[in-house]
From Swiss-Prot:
<protein>
    <recommendedName>
        <fullName>Uncharacterized protein MJ1445</fullName>
    </recommendedName>
</protein>
<dbReference type="GO" id="GO:0016787">
    <property type="term" value="F:hydrolase activity"/>
</dbReference>
<dbReference type="InterPro" id="IPR004843">
    <property type="entry name" value="Calcineurin-like_PHP_ApaH"/>
</dbReference>
<dbReference type="Pfam" id="PF00149">
    <property type="entry name" value="Metallophos"/>
</dbReference>
<dbReference type="InterPro" id="IPR029052">
    <property type="entry name" value="Metallo-depent_PP-like"/>
</dbReference>
Length: 176
């Protein structure tokens, strides 16, 4: 039997038209963006996999109802960490994997991260501050999994571990 994989992703902002302009996303409209994000997610994640979603799932009217409908379409067991636009989810979670300690949190500048000695996996900054918050930042021990940085699909924790072991800055997943 194959192992469950662990994936991470943040800041999908489903249904949020302005995010396309604001973050320079390569979509012409919300429908295209939503469809692509769902397709990318389901091409990567299988039903038994775990996805840590690090906040800001959806922005729309009837958000709770729309979020439930959306989640029906996405593969995997999804664990929610609350983003600044969310009303649900844990504030953060600490996990251990392959000998590393990771704090999963939406905003890396949160006071919860202050005395944490492991790696911080976060979203929130999108691709707007890549010098400070690239995909992999060994100096800060931070990992940015905002969708713009990871090419609009969930990224595996196995890949993240491989990259942090190399000890190099990786601006976006497209630089690999």
């Amino acid at each position: 039997m194959s192992m469950r994989k662990i994936y991470l992703i943040s800041d999908t902002h489903f249904n949020h038209a302005n995010i396309i302009k604001y973050c320079n996303r390569p979509f012409s409209n919300v429908e295209e963006m939503n469809k692509t994000l769902i397709k990318n997610w389901n091409n990567v994640v299988r039903d038994k996999d775990i996805v840590y979603f690090l906040g800001d799932l959806i922005l729309s009217k009837n958000k709770a109802k729309k979020a439930r409908e959306l989640l029906e379409l996405l593969n995997g067991e999804i664990v929610f960490i609350r983003g600044n636009h969310d009303k649900f989810g844990e504030k953060f979670r600490v996990i251990e994997y392959n000998g590393y300690k990771f704090m999963l949190i939406h905003n890396p500048d949160s006071s919860y991260t202050l005395n944490f000695d492991g790696w911080i996996i976060h979203g929130h900054h999108h691709a707007n501050h890549l010098d400070e918050y690239p995909f992999i930042n060994p100096k800060r021990k931070s990992i940015n999994v905002s969708v713009e940085v990871i090419n609009y699909k969930p990224v595996s924790l196995d890949l993240i571990v491989k990259l942090i072991e190399k000890g190099k800055v990786v601006r976006t997943i497209n630089d690999l």
